[in-house]
């Protein structure tokens, strides 16, 4: 299994629609504005966060249960920024839609810009032949409100290609998050 380079990522996005929309260079700033970088890097792709957020609030229940999750535990926000309360979390989605090849596993890591502010990004691996918008989870580990910026970089995807295809892909087994669009809540 090997990590894939910017050349491979660019080719797969342009010829096979692996990432849409696709930014073929790393964007660090536009005109005089500062942005958190996004687009292709040497061995990865920095994804952007869309402007749709679900911010967790504990007004309806005392227990968070992944088997019986209360959608009312979130406040929906559409904005260029999202303020996450102290010691809380928010869900969002990537701007980009992914189509992962059958012989590739994709790992997501948070960006240091956010990590150094106490904001942790969590995403499970994107499995072979999974496709959809990636639901992002942001944890604010600080005792102060934390800000997330829409349409800027929030995490980096690393593409690992196996030397052989898997026997059963995410698509083959009818994965419950296949083809997800928008911010997707837990499913069982």
Curated annotation (Swiss-Prot):
Where do the annotations place dCTP binding? 111-116, 135-137, 156, 170, 180
Q: What Pfam families does the record tag this protein with?
A: DCD
A GO molecular function held by the record: dCTP deaminase activity
Active-site positions on this chain: 137
Q: What keywords are annotated for this sequence in UniProt? A: Hydrolase, Nucleotide metabolism, Nucleotide-binding
**E.C. designation(s):** 3.5.4.13
Pathway, per record: Pyrimidine metabolism; dUMP biosynthesis; dUMP from dCTP (dUTP route): step 1/2
NCBIfam families for the chain? dCTP_deam (TIGR02274)
Q: Which family does it belong to?
A: Belongs to the dCTP deaminase family.
Question: What's the protein here called?
Answer: dCTP deaminase
Species whose genome carries this gene? Pseudomonas putida (strain GB-1)
Query: What gene name is listed for this protein?
Result: dcd
């Amino acid at each position: 299994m090997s990590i894939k380079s910017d050349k491979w990522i660019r080719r797969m996005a342009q010829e096979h629609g692996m990432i849409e929309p696709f930014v073929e260079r790393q964007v660090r700033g536009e005109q005089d504005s500062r942005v958190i970088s996004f687009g292709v890097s040497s061995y990865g792709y920095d994804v952007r966060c869309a402007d749709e957020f679900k911010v967790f609030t504990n007004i309806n229940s005392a227990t968070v249960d992944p088997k019986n999750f209360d959608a009312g535990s979130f406040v929906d926000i559409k904005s260029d920024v999202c303020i996450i309360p102290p010691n809380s979390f928010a869900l969002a989605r990537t701007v980009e839609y992914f189509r992962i090849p059958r012989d590739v596993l994709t790992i997501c890591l948070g960006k240091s810009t956010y990590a150094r502010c106490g904001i942790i990004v969590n995403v499970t691996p994107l499995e072979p032949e999974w496709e959809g918008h990636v639901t992002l989870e942001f944890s604010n580990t600080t005792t102060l409100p934390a800000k997330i910026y829409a349409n800027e970089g929030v995490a980096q995807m690393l593409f690992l290609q196996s030397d052989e295809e898997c026997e059963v892909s995410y698509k083959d087994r009818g994965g419950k998050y296949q083809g997800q669009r928008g911010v997707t809540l837990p499913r069982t």
